[in-house]
């Protein structure tokens, strides 16, 4: 995906655990039948629920579902909003069945660095894929954070094949904010990443450049089935080996 793409970070607030399951089922149907098709111009569709080690498949008492959708252009994003069969129908069902406790939150972000995926094996169809979401606010500038992260991205790319995604996003409306999405093959990949000396070093550097504690700004999630991340559009068969953002 090029620098002119647009990402939509979504936060959904289902009214109950049962309604959360209903939302996920509806979303997964759309992922299979719409978002993977060429007309969607969607390069990533990753939805996730809170990671709970003791009950990996359960949903929290106050359920929340988050997701990242990436489109090739703003026009592609608008096309899916206008789609009557999947997007608009989904929201009709949400309203009819009172699936949400409160309105969803949608925030637009723009690719700024890192990589979206590595190869076809990293398309999110595996079980157990974990996702970390970190929101950072720089003390001075976004570029300060990028200066710290760029060398680390290179290290992750070269040495951590089980880190499927390491994607950095910016937001013009909040120029000092940075969104970091990292997808891991499994718990082992997450553990190895967090315990690496290089990770410890980059966290220390970021801590000095951030307004708040980075450890309090990161949440961990488990990716739902039917999520996918690929470079390019269409049926997912045409992908770069290293999809740079």
Sequence positions of predicted segments:
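Short S/T/G/P-rich N-terminal loop/turn motif that feeds into the first structured element of a domain
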Residues: 1-245
């Amino acid at each position: 995906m090029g620098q002119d793409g647009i990402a939509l970070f979504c936060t959904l607030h289902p009214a109950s655990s049962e309604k959360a399951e209903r939302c996920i089922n509806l979303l997964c149907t759309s992922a299979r039948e719409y978002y993977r098709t060429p007309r969607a111009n969607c390069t990533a569709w990753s939805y996730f629920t809170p990671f709970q080690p003791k009950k990996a498949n359960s949903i929290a008492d106050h359920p929340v579902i988050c997701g990242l959708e990436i489109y090739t252009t703003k026009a592609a994003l608008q096309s899916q909003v206008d789609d009557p069969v999947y997007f608009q129908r989904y929201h009709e069902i949400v309203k009819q069945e009172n699936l949400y406790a409160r309105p969803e939150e949608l925030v637009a972000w723009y690719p700024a660095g890192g990589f979206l995926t590595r190869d076809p094996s990293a398309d999110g169809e595996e079980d157990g894929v974990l996702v970390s979401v970190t929101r950072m606010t720089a003390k001075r500038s976004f570029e300060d954070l990028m200066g710290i992260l760029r060398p680390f991205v290179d290290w992750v790319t070269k040495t951590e094949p089980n880190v499927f995604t390491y994607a950095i996003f910016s937001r013009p409306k909040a120029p000092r904010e940075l969104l970091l999405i990292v997808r891991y093959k499994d718990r082992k990949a997450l553990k190895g990443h967090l315990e690496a000396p290089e990770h410890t070093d980059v966290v220390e550097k970021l801590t000095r450049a951030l307004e708040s504690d980075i450890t309090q700004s990161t949440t961990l999630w488990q990716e739902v089935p039917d999520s996918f991340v690929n470079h390019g559009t269409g049926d997912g068969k045409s992908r770069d080996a290293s999809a740079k953002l």
